[in-house]
Structures are given as structure tokens and as C-alpha cells.
């Protein structure tokens, strides 16, 4: 893959690089997020446990996906559009290549093997660090482990490994929901309690909250999702084209060898 800037290819500044990474990972959209101390564990009812087990079973069925993604975001009155190739592989690998009008990648972001790398081909700059809840909170402003990223782009919800609390909440306009509190953040999941299909996911971490609403066609196939955060200071849509699952992606599809002269900086 060639990382040089082509003729007419848009220049991506450090600010735009960070903004684009916010877009492609869909849920890191609000600044000022902090990670609270884990809450104490609480007993979980049998009904809630059945719902959790259903989510786990569906999550464990996820393999990989490949799709073209059209991303539109409005942030503080500013609009941004990206189109690119999105790859995801369970349990925790995601790659997005934003394409220029000429079809060349100008921004590449990869979460793989516990590392987070965002590279701008236009400026030859990269931001790298461990892909943990803390580092994604610093870069993406919301604490998301790699498995949560894969779950979101795949249309699922992955219950926290370190589950502290779980309860079924009374129905609202969207129906009943499941509240799951882990060591890092809280998830509220609106789902079909018979099939386990997730309709909407709210992720609450620190002072930030993001809501992901999945879009599916008449046959139930995932077509993308909408996202809002910061009391709708940020809103966005992600629409998939030619989505394929079970394509047999391997680790090589998520390898990103930076140019030797690339400027790198750690996630702060």
C-alpha cells in the first residue's frame, strides 16, 4: 500500500485526523470523559441473566465483516463526510480506510492485538497506543474496549466481562431494556428478549453518553446505524453498502506497517 499524498488528495491536519477517527469509530464523540471507580457487584435476577446469556450467545457467533461505509457527522454545526472500507473481526480487531475521491486511502485507523493506530497518509503522521478503555477515552472521548468497537459496528452488544450489575428496566417508548454495569461504563440495551436482536444501545461513561440506533432492512439485515452524543451536540449516520459477513479475515488484514519516516506520537 502506498501512503504518499496523491495529486488533489485532501490534506488532513492533526485536528482533522482526530476528528475523523472520532467519526469512524462511531461512538467516541464527546470530550471530557473520565473513568469512574468500578461499582460493587450486585445480585442479578434470573430474568436478567437469561437476557445476558442470550446476548453472549449472539456475540459469540460473530466472526467478521467487510463493508463499504458512508459516514456523515455533524459536530457543533460542522459537517464531515467520509466513505471508506470497514473491516471488523471478533473479538477485537477493526480497520477503517477512508478513501479520497480518487480511491486512495488518506486516513487509516486500526485496532488490533490490543493496539490503536491512526495514520494520516496526507501528513505522514500517526497516533499510536494501547487499545484500552483509558486510551480510547483519551483519544475518542469514550471508554470502549476493542470488543465493544467490534460489537457496535457489527450490530451487536457485548456484555461486559467484568459485569457488576444487571437488571431489566421498565418499558419506555422503545420497550423494555437491559441495564448492564461493568467496571468501566454502563450499557443500556433495547432488544428483542426472545431473539436477542439489539435495536438500540446506549453507552454511558463518565460525563458522556452516546446512543447507537441500529438500522436493519425488512429482512432484519444490518444496514448501518445512527449515533448521537453530547445531548445531540454530535449526531451521525453510518450506512453500509455490500455488507458481507464470515469472509474469513485474518490477522494480516489488520496489520499496518507505517512508513519508516512517519511521525508518530503516543496517545495522551
Predicted segment positions?
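Sec-dependent bacterial lipoprotein signal peptides
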Residues: 1-33
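N-terminal leader/targeting segments and the immediate start of mature chains
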Residues: 33-81, 260-268
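Edge/loop elements at the starts and ends of beta-strands within beta-rich repeat scaffolds
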Residues: 57-65, 77-80, 87-92, 109, ...
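Hydrophobic lipid-interacting interfaces of membrane-associated proteins
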Residues: 70-76, 101-104, 119, 185-187, ...
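An acidic-aromatic
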Residues: 92-148
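Scaffold/interface architecture of coatomer-like assemblies
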Residues: 151-156
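Gly/Pro-enriched, hydrophobic low-complexity segments
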Residues: 165-268
Amino acid at each position: 500500500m502506498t501512503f504518499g499524498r496523491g495529486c488533489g488528495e485532501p490534506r488532513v491536519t492533526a485536528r482533522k485526523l482526530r476528528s475523523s477517527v472520532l467519526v469512524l469509530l462511531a461512538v467516541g464523540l464527546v470530550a471530557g470523559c473520565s473513568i469512574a471507580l468500578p461499582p460493587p457487584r450486585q445480585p442479578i435476577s434470573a430474568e436478567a441473566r437469561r437476557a445476558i446469556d442470550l446476548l453472549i450467545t449472539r456475540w459469540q457467533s460473530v466472526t467478521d465483516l467487510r463493508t463499504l461505509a458512508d459516514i456523515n457527522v455533524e459536530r457543533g454545526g460542522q459537517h464531515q463526510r467520509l466513505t471508506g472500507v470497514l473491516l471488523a473481526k471478533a473479538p477485537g480487531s477493526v480497520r477503517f480506510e477512508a478513501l479520497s475521491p480518487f480511491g486512495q486511502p488518506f486516513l487509516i485507523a486500526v485496532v488490533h492485538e490490543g493496539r490503536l493506530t491512526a495514520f494520516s497518509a496526507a501528513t505522514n503522521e500517526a497516533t499510536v497506543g494501547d487499545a484500552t478503555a483509558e486510551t480510547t477515552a483519551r483519544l475518542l472521548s469514550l471508554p470502549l474496549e476493542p470488543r465493544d468497537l467490534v460489537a457496535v459496528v457489527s450490530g451487536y452488544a457485548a456484555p461486559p466481562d467484568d459485569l457488576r450489575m444487571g437488571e431489566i428496566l421498565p418499558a419506555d417508548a422503545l420497550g423494555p431494556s437491559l441495564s448492564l454495569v461493568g467496571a468501566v461504563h454502563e450499557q443500556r440495551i433495547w432488544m428483542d428478549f426472545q431473539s436477542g436482536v439489539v435495536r438500540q444501545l446506549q453507552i454511558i461513561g463518565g460525563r458522556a453518553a452516546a446512543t447507537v440506533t441500529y438500522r436493519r432492512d425488512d429482512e432484519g439485515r444490518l444496514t448501518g446505524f445512527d449515533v448521537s452524543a453530547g445531548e445531540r451536540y454530535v449526531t451521525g449516520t453510518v450506512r453500509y453498502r455490500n455488507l458481507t459477513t464470515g469472509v474469513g479475515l485474518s490477522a494480516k488484514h489488520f496489520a499496518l506497517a507505517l512508513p519508516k519516516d512517519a511521525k508518530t506520537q503516543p496517545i495522551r
